[in-house]
């Protein structure tokens, strides 16, 4: 049976089970990570019973002994005294668990370890894990930078790489704040999550700056040819570099000198409309998103990093002016980067286009009476509704907005479950259990697109006829592009026929009679609660609230 509202893991559980565990070489233990404690003392003499906690099981818990070489040994009293002073812990000095084979692991953040090895690199704000040849590896992107490149625009790297993710995340940050007019992703680094070993790979072999550093520190780097196919398949275009590029393109997409100096056609990255009102007032930008999609100039869906543009200025009329993507798939061949990796594709919408920007699309979602009613029902009682990322997607010659909606119990151990999907195309809004159904609502029937969640809850798959032209008749702008000679696709299109009286009725979601009954009961219980509260009849109010909770629980069960 397919459980559509929960993620499907390759490996999960404690102890872990899944496809990775089936491999004898898989090492699931993580001693180095962005969230690791300041230090840890590990290791024991050979033959000693293990006492390091591994994972909970039974009343005692499973134990393990670290077998790597991840830190200095502290078996003698002098070393223990030094580290006790450094970390301000008398346990290092007096604990009987510190023995002749003990190692102390510190500097456990992957980014920190790479910075210790290569302090001359500027490091990307996001570190991500991948399983490479059976080992968990943290991947860190490294940049060479300069502020002395002739005839180039100076940019504050810290400001250019800020967005709502860096503002709210404890593990993702912007680039170091410094001015630069030269930046290249010249290095890919990996940190082994088990023993902390660092490997540096030259990614951009043509970069003169990294060539100079290689001469200063011979033997520090592995060559591109040494990157295994397994590691290559996990490498991707880095976010911070893309954010710097999208910031520069807000001005430098203009090719006319007069328009450039007047600034009349400048763009800006939209504020993240899913953030709080306070964050939006501080102009916290929408982050780029990794998506697999087909854009102008690509012949098939490509793993890409994407962002959008709106006109510069403070106008409240927010329309979409451009859509930027970069091919982020590095391929899976040893020592060979994918042919289109790093290709920027800019799709520019016509100046007379009225395609809503992300903020306007979010307002359309919020203003829908049907959407608000059902979200209020889902949020009543002990559940909270969480809006997901607002995604901009090219579809059928136009652009659509997609936003997942999650429901999360108020319990401390609960996690969000996908319950609904919002879709907007022009002024039309779809709201259904799956992306496939929401697209059908927006396009008044068969959207012609087969979404990845088209599989029904019972595991069966609905068949669809490919009618790609259908998806292009709603309210969006065409954005068909052609490749530029410099690796950037600049594309523009014309307005599609946007007659709101034809071809788009909004559709209706299919709903079982039991689910309708449960939602009607919940609606009636809410009315009864309001009436009882106005009368001051708290006994009736409590009874109505009980019925409301029962109806909502039943509705949630029926939707799973």
Show which residues each predicted segment covers.
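Soluble extracytoplasmic regions of secretory-pathway and membrane proteins
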Residues: 4-489, 495-499, 504-535, 539-543, ...
